[in-house]
Structure formats: C-alpha cells, structure tokens
C-alpha cells in the first residue's frame, strides 16, 4: 500500500511538471505571408467601391498598364515602411461598366531604401526597382486570381480594352 501511494505521488508530481512545461507560451508568433495577405484583404475590402478609395485619399495616377490596370495612388502613405494593411497603390480594371479592384501594390521610394524592402514573410514576394517612377514596387493580386502567382507584377487575366484608355498614359513598361 505504501508503494502504491508513493508511485501515485510520483506520477502526480511528474504529471504536474509535464503539464506546467506544456503551458501556454506567450511569446509573439511571427506573421506568415498568409496572415499578412489576410490583413491586407481585410483593410482594403472597402476599396472594392472606388468612391471609398477616392474619399480616403487615393487619386488616379493616370498610369494604365496592360496586364495590370489603372493605378490609384495615396501619396500620403509613401514612406520607407512596408505595412501590409496600408498599400500605397490600388489597382483597378474595368469590368461590366465599373472599376473592379484587382490588386494592391506596395511602393517605397528608391531614395528611402537602397535595397528591396522587407515585405511579406517568406521569400515568395519579389520587389521590383522601378527607376522610371523612383519606386520599389510589389503587387499582391488579392481580388483577381493570377496564374503566375499572387506577387507577380503582371496578370495575364487583365486585358484592357483600348477604348477604355482614352485620356490615359498607357505605359507598356512592366514595373
């Protein structure tokens, strides 16, 4: 009987120690690109209505690129920081008579960062140095599936009708 109590006490102490070792770890977790993309989508969902983007300071840059779309820039967001929930540029494409949000684009001035900014977690994102506009840029195709990948600069599914480009500067350069 004494051995049974001793064994039970040892088992109880061992179990308590094991339980304590498995307790909640309150160390912050590193974001993943999926959680960052979800944050970007949550923050920009409202901009599916172009009038909301305009009200929040995005202005048409009058730069249109085939396989990208119409770019709307919020210059007040241009800085040396990458913030997934604050894209500097929204990209729209005409669809059924209205402008559809297809992607967000991040931009960091080249003069504020000598190398590509740290962006989404992992290595899937690929920033481009666009010397014509003086920006590091990165697209995230959140609202239009892109067969080439969410971070690819262009999207073959975006084919703009030349009739919609009147008054725009059509820029064939891919950034």
Model segments located where?
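C-terminal motif of bacterial Sec signal peptides marking the signal peptidase cleavage site
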Residues: 18-21
């Amino acid at each position: 009987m004494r051995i049974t109590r001793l064994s039970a006490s040892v088992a109880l102490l061992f179990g308590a120690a094991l339980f304590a070792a498995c307790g909640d770890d309150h160390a912050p977790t590193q974001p993943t690109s999926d959680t960052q993309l979800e944050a970007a989508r949550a923050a920009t969902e409202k901009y599916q209505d172009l009038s909301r983007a305009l009200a929040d300071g995005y202005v048409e840059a009058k730069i249109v690129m085939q396989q990208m779309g119409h770019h709307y820039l919020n210059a007040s967001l241009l800085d040396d920081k990458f913030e997934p929930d604050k894209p500097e540029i929204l990209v729209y494409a005409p669809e059924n008579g209205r402008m559809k949000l297809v992607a967000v684009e991040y931009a960091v001035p080249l003069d504020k960062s000598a190398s590509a900014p740290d962006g989404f977690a992992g290595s899937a994102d690929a920033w481009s140095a666009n010397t014509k506009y003086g920006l590091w840029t990165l697209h995230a195709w959140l609202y239009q599936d892109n067969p080439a990948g969410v971070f690819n600069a262009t999207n073959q599914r975006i084919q703009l009708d030349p009739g919609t480009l009147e008054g725009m500067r059509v820029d064939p350069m891919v950034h």
